[in-house]
Swiss-Prot record:
Family: Belongs to the cytochrome b family.
One Pfam family of this chain: Cytochrom_B_C
Protein name: Cytochrome b
Gene name of this polypeptide: MT-CYB
Lineage: Eukaryota, Metazoa, Chordata, Craniata, Vertebrata
Quaternary organization: The cytochrome bc1 complex contains 11 subunits: 3 respiratory subunits (MT-CYB, CYC1 and UQCRFS1), 2 core proteins (UQCRC1 and UQCRC2) and 6 low-molecular weight proteins (UQCRH/QCR6, UQCRB/QCR7, UQCRQ/QCR8, UQCR10/QCR9, UQCR11/QCR10 and a cleavage product of UQCRFS1). This cytochrome bc1 complex then forms a dimer.
Binding-site positions, a ubiquinone: 201
Functional summary from the UniProt entry: Component of the ubiquinol-cytochrome c reductase complex (complex III or cytochrome b-c1 complex) that is part of the mitochondrial respiratory chain. The b-c1 complex mediates electron transfer from ubiquinol to cytochrome c. Contributes to the generation of a proton gradient across the mitochondrial membrane that is then used for ATP synthesis.
Amino acid sequence: MTNIRKSHPLAKIINESFIDLPAPSNISAWWNFGSLLGVCLIIQILTGLFLAMHYTSDTMTAFSSVTHICRDVNYGWIIRYIHANGASMFFICLFMHVGRGVYYGSFTFTETWNIGILLMFTVMATAFMGYVLPWGQMSFWGATVITNLLSAIPYVGTNLVEWIWGGFSVDKATLTRFFAFHFILPFIISALAAVHLLFLHETGSNNPSGVVSDSDKIPFHPYYTIKDILGLLLLILVLMLLVLFSPDLLGDPNNYIPANPLNTPPHIKPEWYFLFAYAILRSIPNKLGGVLALVLSILILAIVPLLHTSKQRSMMFRPLSQCLFWLLVADLLTLTWIGGQPVEHPFITIGQLASILYFSIFLILMPISGIIENRLLKW
């Protein structure tokens, strides 16, 4: 008699995805982040669901409903802070996951990679809308500034912004629709993640060496289920340390002030995980140019496979490319720092130099280093 997990139509899909899946024998801890992103998504959907039971998406009551959740709802404070800091953990895992893809050449699976980029945009949109919902000062002004960027689009810009706002400014209609979108998007992300996995399982996983590992595969369970559980425990440890000891560490104090359209905060900035893109946006004096640079800062990942000149897939044995990769990481950290600073000297200049370096690494330096490494190996 065949095992039910191999014969039942539904169990068979789960079995082929998480149990009997052939996996390379040498994948490192950098391959944990995919499953951690799945866990983060589940945590966010569950905590978000419980928050939505008590939240009201009305400009008059949104702020006080969040206060009510923290003060009066049983364990409401911990649900709220797990959700807020869970978003930060989500983005940490996301950046690590993308970084691993760039370092080890996983972008050569173009379908999986492109779905991943689409997922990244969707997650960023969801996080942005979620930041608006508590209706604090930074929520309101963040929504105003970021949506206003669309007005830079020629001809249709102003109409598009007013259409998104549902009026002539960020108001009740905006908050209501942002709540609706924030609720539905995680389910769209879940569907996209399933497609992401579908394409990945067509090719099989990459591995640190970048060499095809078809001749050396091991079953996903128990080897990588155990390995993923270790990553999961570390994720939960870091998340709970954040939630229980310093829940507001990554937030903005201005968001504890109710939204006031008549009073602009001294320095409007998004959450920390958007600061690198925000710094790139601000480094260009022209509004349309800034918006294009903002979009391209993520979209540039789509042309990484096209600009891959090396005959080796992974950077594991390419010291020159490794130096450029870590320069890129340092550059992103610099941009994140600059995004949180006021627009004044010397931060403007540092931001502009860091932005130029960011695009140069992807468009010029990485392809050149690939060609040089090929020559050094006489390929």
